[in-house]
């Protein structure tokens, strides 16, 4: 009896590699990929391996009649490392990255999940610790929490178009606290001591790109800003560094993720909005001066000669880009092309 991979993105492809290693026969289904979108009789499959991004109602429906597994469920069952799960609306990647640098001083460490390699690619690879960045999608679909350490950094409204309400999003995030040991601590040095029982020497911790990253003395690339909470954090930092009313904010992305919530922008001298969702974003904003452009290049041409720029989109990429990485790279490229000549 065959199994089925449901969703053929990054996680789906890791399921494929995993099942091939296990000599398990399988089919693939993904409604968004024509080669794999033909209708399936899901009841005929022995197991269904589900990617985290599939809609939660589809997942709930599959679970009624099938044995459904996620990559996290499999990793929990098979891997023997000490498992540290980290989640939060913001700064989870940075916290994972910083904690990994501290633990790696003395012990072997996997950095996996949303931040690194898919978890299935690193099962029992000999590392002592596994630091796993977990999204609300993964936590929502996780059958049972077998983490040794679960860390919830913060919660603010996000992914509301998936969870349907902030309360459901919060419930998903808080599942991480069902670990053997749980914490709300965010300082990586305190987390290191809590987990290992040792103090770490102070390091010059490396940061991830596109998180309030200065690409020039007066230009910040914060492309990782995909929600209003991270946007407000960036504005607070910019208000301190550049001073209020002394910088321009550039925004873009899809506001449907936050159900078109109204946001009041205080700090920048002007807000520049561009992209396919520009009209939707403009309707969500309150600011004394909002300038709207079709594309990023036109936005930067307008800003040429102006002092201090904060690129903090505040929304996920939507129709404009594949992801925040592509968005951030495009911003860096156009800054060089438009502003450096």
Predicted features, each with a name:
Residues 1-85, 209-211, 282-285, 293-307, ...:
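Short, basic phosphate-binding NTP loop
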Residues 29, 108-125:
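Conserved substrate/cofactor phosphate-moiety recognition/catalytic segment
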Residues 71-115:
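Walker A (P-loop) phosphate-binding motif
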Residues 126-186, 191, 319-325:
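Flexible active-site lid/hinge loop adjacent to a nucleotide/diphosphate
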Residues 18, 108-109, 187-269:
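Nucleotide phosphate-binding/pyrophosphate-handling subdomain across enzymes
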Residues 27-29, 184, 248-252, 268-278:
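Short internal beta-strands
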Residues 255-308:
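C-terminal helical cap/extension that packs against the catalytic core
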Residues 52-55, 91, 136-138, 157-158, ...:
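Short glycine-rich anion-binding loops that position phosphate/pyrophosphate groups of nucleotides
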């Amino acid at each position: 009896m065959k199994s089925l991979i449901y969703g053929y993105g990054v996680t789906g492809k890791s399921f494929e590699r995993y099942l091939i290693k296990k000599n398990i026969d399988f089919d693939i289904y993904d409604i968004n990929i024509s080669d794999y979108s033909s209708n399936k009789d899901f009841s005929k499959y022995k197991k269904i391996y589900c990617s985290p991004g599939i809609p939660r109602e589809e997942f709930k429906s599959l679970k009624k009649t099938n044995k459904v597994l996620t990559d996290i469920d499999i990793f929990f069952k098979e891997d023997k490392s000490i498992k540290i799960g980290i989640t939060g609306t913001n700064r989870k990647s940075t916290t994972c990255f910083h904690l990994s640098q501290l633990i790696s001083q003395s012990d072997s460490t996997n950095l996996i999940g949303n931040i690194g390699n898919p978890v299935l690619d690193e099962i029992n690879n000999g590392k002592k610790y596994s630091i796993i960045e977990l999204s609300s999608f993964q936590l929502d679909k996780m059958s049972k929490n077998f983490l040794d350490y679960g860390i919830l950094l913060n919660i603010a409204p996000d992914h509301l178009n998936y969870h349907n309400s902030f309360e459901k999003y919060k419930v998903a995030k808080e599942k991480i606290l069902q670990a053997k040991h749980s914490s709300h601590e965010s300082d990586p040095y305190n987390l290191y001591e809590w987990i290992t029982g040792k103090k770490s020497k102070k390091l010059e911790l490396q940061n991830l790109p596109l998180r309030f990253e200065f690409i020039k003395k007066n230009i910040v690339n914060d492309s990782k800003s995909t929600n209003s909470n991270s946007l407000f954090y960036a504005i607070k930092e910019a208000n301190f560094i550049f001073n209020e009313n002394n910088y321009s904010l550039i925004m873009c992305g899809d506001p449907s993720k936050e159900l078109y919530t109204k946001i009041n922008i205080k700090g920048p001298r002007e807000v520049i909005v561009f992209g396919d969702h520009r009209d939707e974003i403009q309707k969500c904003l309150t600011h004394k001066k909002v300038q709207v452009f079709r594309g990023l290049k036109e936005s930067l041409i307008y800003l040429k000669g102006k002092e201090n720029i904060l690129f903090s989109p505040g929304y996920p990429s939507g129709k404009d880009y594949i992801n925040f990485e592509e968005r951030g790279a495009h911003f860096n490229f156009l800054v060089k092309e438009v502003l450096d000549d």
